[in-house]
């Protein structure tokens, strides 16, 4: 149990780390000159697709300050592809993974995206890495039209209710803050029967995206929100807390990440607020539980969301450890493994000539199960990242402050009884 809790906490830290040339269009179909009575395949395969292999790649920080994240992340991707390749590949093709080291630098990331797509001729991006690089290149990725599976960040630009056209090739897996904000409201209503919800959110992208998601779901459910904004990293949030307290809400969303959430929780306790709080998976770490456990004791509970369930993933963890023995307990390698899995599941579904359009169709054709978590459904252009999340709360784990599991992975529909 202690090992699992430690890994879960480390997975939350992944998000904190992850907190140009002419564009090449997708290959066009070539008209066939074969007589109609002898139909043959006339589609040309997409770039990066060969008779015996399919080439994919990414740029990630494998040197510099973020190398401890980027190196195992890519190792996880490579381990998954090695497993697939040694079993014969996908439809007779091995998966070849190429990589550029962008050092977490958005300028280098833009240049390396150009190299990967136009020089290396990759079929798809797998594991586009880091908030600054993804933020700087997301429009370029869309302009190329290349499929991009798994982003090591949760920025709001990845979210789309119905992706079409140039937006369609974006396939996020990690939680996106906008989706998480919606799930927080679904938990508040479904689990805690809240009718009036307070939201304290920071004025940075994370806080605004969480609040945006909460607003959308509250409007859909006809639930009242009372919201107060605070400065990210603020040391005094007393005014916002007083407003929420006086509004007599049923439940509170702490839409802030590590630098601010302890201040919010401590001030709620100081003002003797007795309403439970829920916060983002990014905060589900020992550092946060240790910071607030003494202040909240007996006053209210602090809950956090999560996107993996290692306690019920023993077989998947054993398979991961077999193929990535040097990284068997490394959470960054686990996320790379997840990235490799999602790409491969889409590829397995493609029939006939492998094109970008067919691959996108394949990813949208049915939900895909996270080997360590819930399912993600890309149907009808849904690009929401993780859509099933579990629940834990601050408490004692092995006589130390930690996060105690409360409820398993559930979708918003399940939480709301739909």
Model feature map: region roles:
Residues 18-29:
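Bacterial lipoprotein signal-peptidase II cleavage site
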Residues 41-50, 57-78, 100-107, 129-130, ...:
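Extracytoplasmic "Venus flytrap"
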Residues 1-4:
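Positively charged n-region of N-terminal signal peptides that target proteins for export
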Residues 268-337, 411-413:
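Extracellular/periplasmic periplasmic-binding protein-like sensory domains
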Residues 121-228, 276-297, 301, 310:
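Extracytoplasmic ligand/sensor domains, especially the bilobed periplasmic-binding protein
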């Amino acid at each position: 149990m202690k090992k699992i809790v430690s890994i879960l906490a480390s997975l939350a830290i992944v998000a904190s780390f992850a907190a140009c040339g002419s564009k090449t269009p997708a290959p066009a179909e070539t008209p066939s000159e074969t007589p109609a009575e002898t139909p043959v395949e006339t589609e040309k395969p997409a770039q990066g697709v060969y008779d015996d292999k399919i080439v994919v790649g990414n740029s990630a920080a494998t040197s510099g300050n973020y190398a401890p994240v980027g190196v195992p992340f890519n190792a996880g991707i490579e381990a998954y592809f090695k497993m697939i390749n040694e079993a014969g590949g996908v439809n007779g093709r091995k998966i070849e993974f190429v990589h550029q080291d962008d050092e977490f630098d958005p300028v280098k990331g833009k240049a390396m995206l150009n190299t990967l797509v136009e020089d290396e001729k990759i079929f798809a991006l797998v594991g586009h890495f880091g908030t600054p690089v993804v933020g700087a290149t997301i429009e370029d990725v869309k302009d190329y039209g290349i499929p991009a599976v798994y982003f090591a960040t949760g920025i709001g630009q990845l979210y789309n209710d119905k992706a079409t056209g140039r937006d369609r090739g974006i396939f996020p897996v990690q939680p996106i803050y906008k989706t998480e904000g919606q799930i927080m409201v679904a938990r508040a209503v479904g689990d805690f029967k809240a009718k009036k919800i307070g939201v304290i959110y920071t004025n940075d992208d994370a806080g605004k995206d969480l609040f945006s998601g909460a607003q959308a779901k509250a409007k859909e459910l006809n639930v009242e929100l009372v919201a107060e904004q605070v400065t990210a990293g603020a040391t005094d949030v007393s005014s916002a807390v007083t407003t929420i307290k006086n509004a007599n809400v049923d439940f509170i969303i702490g839409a802030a990440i590590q630098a601010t959430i302890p201040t919010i929780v401590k001030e709620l306790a100081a003002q003797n607020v007795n309403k439970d709080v829920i916060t983002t998976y990014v905060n589900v770490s020992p550092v946060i539980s240790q910071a607030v456990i003494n202040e909240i004791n007996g006053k209210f509970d602090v809950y956090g969301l999560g996107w993996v369930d290692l306690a019920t993933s023993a077989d998947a963890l054993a398979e991961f450890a077999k193929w990535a023995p040097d990284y068997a307990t490394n959470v960054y390698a686990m996320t790379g493994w997840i990235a490799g899995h999602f790409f491969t599941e889409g590829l397995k579904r493609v029939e006939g000539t492998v094109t970008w359009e067919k691959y996108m169709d394949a990813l949208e054709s049915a939900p895909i199960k996270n080997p360590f978590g819930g399912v993600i459904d890309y149907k009808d252009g849904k690009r929401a990242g993780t859509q099933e999340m579990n629940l834990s709360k601050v408490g004692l784990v092995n006589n130390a402050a930690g996060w105690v599991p409360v409820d398993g992975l559930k979708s918003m529909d399940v939480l709301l009884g739909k």
